[in-house]
């Protein structure tokens, strides 16, 4: 196929994006709508999600949903809402994650904050993926799932509730990719780093540690997300972790050479 061909097939595909009210989730959801894909925008904030829908290239293709995905009942309601609005979800993006506070280090994070982070990220990602896959398998329909993890799924962040939740998601991607692959459902991870969006507070001084010399924006993730989600572009890619970090993960205590 030509790389200039459309990434998606709007006649056969429909999407569900969590965390679609801001940051990376919003950018990916809007990019899907920009490809003419009917997309459910799910977020915990009604104000944010309605603003994201309104700002989309084709708001008539964007379906809002408001609810806290830490709740199993809300997750079930989201699945029913998506099925009612779209018929069948073929593309799933799990970007929802509670806010991070630098104060929540290992000696300070509360039991409630820990549970909320894991419930939204790991439990939400697992249960939504499993139920969406169940529908696709029954219908013998291929699908593509993308879970947002983090560089800190493998390196400490001083936020143990966040890092452990993302580490769990990284392994979840591999487990689901292996289980669902024979049914034509691909599951991959998108690994952002130093993206000025969502819970990350951008510190301009960080840019000097990034080989590409700048902080990333949520929009830097959207083209890669579309490519990985696309069954036309990435038909043979599953269980992969795609890093989009401007080279931040290459950083160590050595400075680059003067050339």
Where does each model-flagged region fall?
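Conserved glycine-rich Rossmann-like NAD(P)H-binding loop of the short-chain dehydrogenase/reductase
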Residues: 35-51
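Catalytic Tyr-X3-Lys loop
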Residues: 107-126, 146, 169, 211-212
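Active-site loop of short-chain dehydrogenase/reductase
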Residues: 12-13, 88-91, 136-150, 182-185, ...
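Conserved mid-core segment of classical short-chain dehydrogenase/reductases
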Residues: 76, 97-115, 158-161, 199-201, ...
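Conserved glycine-rich cofactor-binding loop
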Residues: 21-22
């Amino acid at each position: 196929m030509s790389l200039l061909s459309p990434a998606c097939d709007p006649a056969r595909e429909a999407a569900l994006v969590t965390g679609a009210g801001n940051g990376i989730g919003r950018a990916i959801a809007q990019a899907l709508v920009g490809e003419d894909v009917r997309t459910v925008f799910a977020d915990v904030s009604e104000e944010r999600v309605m603003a994201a829908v309104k700002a989309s290239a084709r708001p008539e293709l964007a379906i809002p949903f408001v609810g806290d995905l830490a709740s199993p009942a809300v997750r079930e309601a989201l699945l029913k809402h998506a099925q009612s609005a779209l018929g069948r979800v073929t593309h799933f993006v799990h970007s929802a994650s509670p806010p991070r506070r630098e104060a929540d280090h290992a000696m300070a994070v509360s039991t409630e904050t820990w549970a909320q982070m894991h419930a939204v990220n790991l439990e939400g990602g697992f249960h939504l993926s499993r139920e969406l896959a169940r529908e696709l398998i029954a219908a013998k329909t291929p699908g593509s799932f993308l879970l947002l993890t983090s560089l800190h799924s493998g390196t400490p962040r001083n936020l143990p509730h966040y890092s452990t939740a993302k580490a769990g998601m990284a392994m979840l991607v591999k487990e689901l990719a292996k289980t669902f692959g024979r049914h034509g459902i691909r599951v991959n991870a998108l690994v952002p780093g130093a993206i000025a969006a969502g819970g990350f507070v951008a510190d301009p001084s960080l840019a000097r540690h990034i080989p590409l010399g700048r902080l990333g924006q949520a929009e830097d993730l959207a083209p890669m997300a579309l490519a990985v989600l696309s069954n036309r572009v990435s038909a043979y890619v599953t269980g992969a972790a795609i890093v989009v970090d401007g080279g931040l993960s290459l950083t160590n205590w050595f400075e680059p050479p003067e050339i």
